[in-house]
C-alpha cells in the first residue's frame, strides 16, 4: 500500500533485481531520504534490521515480513520526530498496525499479470481469529509466487546494458595488413575493435566493441514468499498478557548476473 504514497519517494518495493544481496526485501523511506532516516515500527515497537544491508550499504527494516492480510492500518508521521524517537526518525515515522482481535475467517487471493509479457504474481492470504484460553488470538498466513521476467523479453531494455570499455586495442605505430581479420591500414594510436564483435554478440560503438550484458539480467526475479503472523492476548485483574510472533521466508530462485563487466 505504501508504494502509492507520494511521501514515500525513495523507497524500494518492487523486485530490486539489481540491488545486490537484498532481493525479495522491501524498504520504505519518507521524503526521499536514505533508509536510515525513517523509523519503521510494528505495533509501535522498534524492529531489528534486515540481515543484509541495502545496495547503498544502509541498514533498514524489511517490511516484507508482515503478511498483508494481517495489516489493519498504517500510520505515517511525515514530519521529523528526532526529539521523541531519536536520530533514526529524521524523515518521519511509519507504524504498521496489525490485527490484535479478529473473529472469523478471511481469505484473499489475487493474480497480477503483465499486459505484454509472460510474468505473473500469485498471492494467497488467510486471516483467522477467535477466542481461546480466556483470551483472543489472531493467525495470518500469506504466500506470494512470482514468476521471472528477463530483460531480453522487453524491447529496447536489454540493449541499454552495454559495457563502458569493450574489447578493443590501440596500435602504437602506423601499420597495414593485407589479409586476415584485421586487414586494413591503421594510423598511430588508432583504437581498433574486435573484428568478430558482432558475430560474437557484441555491439560496435565507434572504435570499440561493447559487451552486451543487459540480456543476462532479470527485470523480475523468480521468487517465493511465505509469511506468518500470530498474536495472542489475555487480560486479568492483575496483569495483561500479550504475545506476537512474525515469521517470513523469502526464496529467490534465480538471480542471473553478467559473467563480466569489461
Model-derived regions: residue spans:
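Surface-exposed beta-strand-turn/loop segments characteristic
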Residues: 3-25, 33-35, 45, 49-262
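Short aromatic-centered micro-motifs
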Residues: 40
